[in-house]
Curated annotation (Swiss-Prot):
Function: FMRFamides and FMRFamide-like peptides are neuropeptides.
Protein name: Extended FMRFamide-6
BP GO terms, sorted: neuropeptide signaling pathway
Subcellular location: Secreted
Organism, as annotated: Striatophasma naukluftense (Gladiator)
Entry annotated with the keyword Secreted: yes
Keyword list, A-Z: Amidation, Neuropeptide, Secreted
Family: Belongs to the FARP (FMRF amide related peptide) family.
Amino acid sequence: GRADNFLRL
């Protein structure tokens, strides 16, 4: 999801 993508930054 988008939240997960943010954490992967």
